[in-house]
Structure formats: structure tokens, C-alpha cells
Amino acid sequence: MSETTDVTKASQESLKYTIAQLGYSGLRVNNGIISEEIKRELQFPQSILTYKQMGYDSTVASALNYYEHMMLKSDMKVKPHPEATEQEKEYATFFQECLEDMEDQSWQDFIQEVSSMNKYGFCVNEIILRKRLESKGSKFNDGKIGIRKLPIRSQDSISKWEYDEEQNLVGLTQTVAKMGKRGKVLLSSKGEEIFIPRNKFLLFRLGKVKDSPVGESPLKACYYAWKYKVAVEEQESCGIHRDLSEIGRAHV
């Protein structure tokens, strides 16, 4: 006996496709602070101090220095494609000129600053442009817009990340402590807050879990081993001190 199936025409409402964004990555952001870590010591911005302390360890420092050295060994040259047009060749030449025409900053200096992401998980460098004029300190005098410098914005100076209603990163807030005489930091002052829009800085990061701007530091996986090592060393030093204090002295 044959079976029959009723087929009804789909409504126009069910055929509509929404092109707008509905969900988001799920990144936990509370008042500009990324709140993904369970351990407070590994949560930004406290993590910056933690990783800085870990960087004093000889084993950790050796690994970080090795990665920095390998990054500095890389040679950066902009070469056009063999089948590039004349205009594309001009673009490549112009970009190479910009990298070699930065003020008080070489390409190696820039890479060395970027290598700090190996410790902290991310690195922010502000984009500062200028007209290529000799009066502005440039090697060229064609009036084109070139790169003045790409200075780092230190990780411990970034206080929060700014997001819009659709959870898109729109910038960051940097807190710069006010300095007194002879470079002394005025601890009683809250410092000055500076907003840097997203199109004004480069963001380098290791890992993009939930598209987090702070990335994921390689030192995170070493944290418990490092903490245990520090605790054992402190216990050993206390034991050695006690043993030495019990050595008697004889006077003749």
C-alpha cells in the first residue's frame, strides 16, 4: 500500500535570512576589563604584574630572550610579485621606504618591542604618521604621508579595552601616571587617561580565543610550576638559614 505525504509550501517568513550579527564571541568584558581567568593573578591587568615577576626567573628569562633573539634575526624586505604592475611595484618601494624612514626607531627596535607579547600575550603599538618632508626629519621630500614611528604602549599602562554595543573593539584607554621632579611618579595622582581608537594602533597577540585583545601568554601554562618552584626555594632558603644559625662557635 503506497504512502502519501502532505507537502505544504513554506511561508515567506521562513525563507528570510538575517544578515545582521545576532550573537557574539562570548568574551567576558566588565567595564573594559577582560574577565576570563579564574585565577585573579592571571586576569588582566593583574596578569601583567604576574608575568613581569615570572620574567625575573632565570629559566623563564632565558626562554624569552631566545624567542626575542630569533625574532630579531628575521630580515624584513618588501618585494613585489614577479607579475606585479608598475603601480604595485611603486607601492612596494614606498612601503619599504617608510620602514626605513622612521624617526628614532629602526625596524629592529620595533620588532624588539613587539616581542614583549611573548611575555604578556599581546603588544600594542601606536601608529604615528607624518608628511615626508625634510623639514619634518624625513629622508624624502615628496610630501607623501609616511610612517613617523610605531612606538609601544606598554602593557602595564593599558587600563581597559573599549567595546561598542555589538562587542566590537573600538579602542583602549591608557592611564599614564603623572611624573614629578627627576622622573619620580606621583603616587597620590590618578594619572591621565588617554583614549586611543582602534584604527590608531597595531595589536599583536598570541592566540585569539574568543577574540580577546589580551591574547594568551605562554607563561600562563608555566604559572603553577613557577609558583611551586618559588615556594620550594623559599622553604629551602629558610632551612639553610636555620641550619647555619645552629652552628656553634668555640673560643680558645
Can you annotate each of these PLM segments?
Residues 71-78, 83:
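Active-site acidic/histidine clusters and adjacent loop/turn architecture
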